[in-house]
């Protein structure tokens, strides 16, 4: 049985967000770095640091929380893995789903790298739908 690194990232971010943790540490691979760059660019996380420990690289993510009188609120409302190792889901650029009418984002793996649904529509390419965030 293989290891699903994308599902691991999504689960650890979702769990840390639900428990209002400030930082989390995930293993660093090319796919995880590209997904984290998209999350940083879209404003779902505040900061990313690369950390080395015993010849292994980790990414330390600082999650973004809104403050109010009761304490920190969640920023990431929902993260969902769409394509998984047992059931891959592909889409061309015309049929990429819109999440909440464009309020959320879909992360795709294309022939030109990992990108959001907006970037894929602008470039006119489709790919594997990895996850959705809203």
Swiss-Prot record:
It comes from the Eukaryota. One of its GO terms (cellular component) is ribonucleoprotein complex. The keyword RNA-binding applies. The keyword Magnesium does not apply. It is found in: Plastid, Chloroplast. Keywords: Chloroplast, Plastid, Ribonucleoprotein, Ribosomal protein, RNA-binding, rRNA-binding. This is Small ribosomal subunit protein uS8c. It comes from Gossypium hirsutum.
